[in-house]
Amino acid sequence: MINKIYGKVIEKKESSLVLMTAVFEFELLVSAFCLANFKLLDKVELFTYLYTKENELKLFGFLNSDERETFKSLIGVSGIGPRAALRVLSNIRYNEFKDAIDREDIELIAKIKGIGKKMAGKMFLHLQGKLLINNELESSLFRFKELEESIVSMGFDRKIVNSKLKEAFNLVEFSNLKDSEKEQFLFKEVLKRMSN
């Protein structure tokens, strides 16, 4: 199984990213949140899921393992295929989806185009208590809270700073750095992205 792909974004389509690796180009179907996270020529790391059915092979890409696990849980629900699962994750973030399931907020899920109340109820019955997320991104954000505060104190909007930090966390350059180098990289990368 292909667990992760490291590559450079060479094309962005309506619902997919094309990544150039050392040898191959891969097109990965991704959520709207994942798509919005990256720009052309960004070097990225995506978790993957290879969907196989009869003569159909599709490669899906995810920001982290939690988003991938949520996708896999969704396609385990009868009547939910990979496209519908991706539509869910394009309308609501994986952690918000888990919260909605835990809170029994069927109305929120039912509002997603193509889902409706009946399917939302089926999701709730199938998934309640089964969605576990590792909060990798959240724990990383907490670790660099002081950095976020220092950038906000420069006059930047907190929500935008938070969003740019999340983008930087998913860059290959960040994951390859020593811990001692990560804060300086994030500071420079976030400021660069804020000015674009």
From Swiss-Prot:
GO cellular component term, pick one: Holliday junction resolvase complex
Signal sequence bounds: none
Region: Domain II, residue numbers: 64-139
Region (Domain III), start-end ranges: 139-196
Keyword Magnesium part of the UniProt annotation: no
Subcellular location: Cytoplasm
InterPro entries tied to this protein: DNA_helicase_Holl-junc_RuvA_I (IPR013849), Hlx-hairpin-Hlx_DNA-bd_motif (IPR003583), NA-bd_OB-fold (IPR012340), RuvA (IPR000085), RuvA_2-like (IPR010994)
Chief localization: cytoplasm
Region (Flexible linker): 139
One Pfam family here: RuvA_N
SMART domains: HhH1
Keywords of this entry: Cytoplasm, DNA damage, DNA recombination, DNA repair, DNA-binding
SUPFAM superfamilies referenced in this protein's UniProt entry, alphabetically: Nucleic acid-binding proteins, RuvA domain 2-like
Summary of the function given for this chain in its UniProt record: The RuvA-RuvB-RuvC complex processes Holliday junction (HJ) DNA during genetic recombination and DNA repair, while the RuvA-RuvB complex plays an important role in the rescue of blocked DNA replication forks via replication fork reversal (RFR). RuvA specifically binds to HJ cruciform DNA, conferring on it an open structure. The RuvB hexamer acts as an ATP-dependent pump, pulling dsDNA into and through the RuvAB complex. HJ branch migration allows RuvC to scan DNA until it finds its consensus sequence, where it cleaves and resolves the cruciform DNA.
HAMAP family xrefs: DNA_HJ_migration_RuvA
Entry's free-text remark on domains: Has three domains with a flexible linker between the domains II and III and assumes an 'L' shape. Domain III is highly mobile and contacts RuvB.
Name under which the protein is recorded: Holliday junction branch migration complex subunit RuvA
Organism field: Borreliella afzelii (strain PKo) (Borrelia afzelii)
